[in-house]
């Protein structure tokens, strides 16, 4: 009888397995923070803690999500932006204590899970269609 109870609890606790590949909502239990759900094509702003010498500050990195990797150790996501004409990509772990906050600026409509083709595009060709929000 105890085995049945354990089998019933397992699907409820494994939210990571039932999460959609394109969107992810991760709860960092160590820091007690919840990241919003986002996926490839979304424009997000990541607030990252940067330590320079003995000083510490928050740096914002806004860009398009290229990929979201979900793994047993929490996974990571890659964000790309164009800075002074040069493409800059940063990969952030979901469970990193250096990621203080993630804001979703706009939702993008894409048909791929990995948007590496954006690396070759520039200007208007690199635009992503925005998801139309239906009024509730």
From Swiss-Prot:
Keywords: Ribonucleoprotein, Ribosomal protein
GO biological process, one term: translation
Residue ranges with Acidic residues bias: 12-23
UniProt GO cellular component terms: cytosolic large ribosomal subunit
A Pfam family recorded for this sequence: Ribosomal_L19
Keyword Flavoprotein included in the entry's annotation: no
GO MF, one example: structural constituent of ribosome
PROSITE patterns per UniProt: RIBOSOMAL_L19 (PS01015)
Source taxon at top rank: Bacteria
Purpose: This protein is located at the 30S-50S ribosomal subunit interface and may play a role in the structure and function of the aminoacyl-tRNA binding site.
Family affiliation: Belongs to the bacterial ribosomal protein bL19 family.
HAMAP family documented for this protein: Ribosomal_bL19
Annotated protein name in UniProt: Large ribosomal subunit protein bL19
Organism whose genome encodes this protein: Dehalococcoides mccartyi (strain ATCC BAA-2266 / KCTC 15142 / 195)
